[in-house]
């Protein structure tokens, strides 16, 4: 199954996010040690295109519980910068083959 995750960060959390960024990238690259397959993702920004306000990801996973487990183990979540998370299942017709995965 495929899922879209939208994560909003707490205002003023940029310094903590920057400090956790490398660990976050390792987590993403491993799919949370194989809990999910990360297809793509990126930061979400203000209209200026620079000020981070969150992030999104598209995942292949056995179910929503696995995506939640991935989010809960993310260094950004552990560091306390996550304000809210929305996880939405994508339709079976989603064309995942068009995306070069970020994790295996």
Regions found by a protein language model. Give the residues of each.
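Conserved, structured core segments of small domains
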Residues: 1-104
């Amino acid at each position: 199954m495929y899922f879209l995750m939208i994560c909003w960060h707490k205002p003023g959390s940029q310094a903590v996010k920057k400090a956790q960024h490398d660990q976050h990238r390792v987590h993403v690259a491993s799919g949370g040690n194989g809990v999910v397959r990360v297809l793509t993702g990126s930061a979400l920004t203000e209209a200026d295109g620079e000020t981070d306000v969150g992030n999104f990801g598209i995942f292949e996973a056995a179910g929503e519980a696995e995506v939640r487990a991935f989010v809960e183990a993310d260094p950004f979540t552990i560091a306390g910068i996550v304000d809210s998370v929305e996880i939405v299942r994508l339709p079976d017709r989603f064309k995942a083959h068009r995306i070069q995965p970020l994790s295996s």
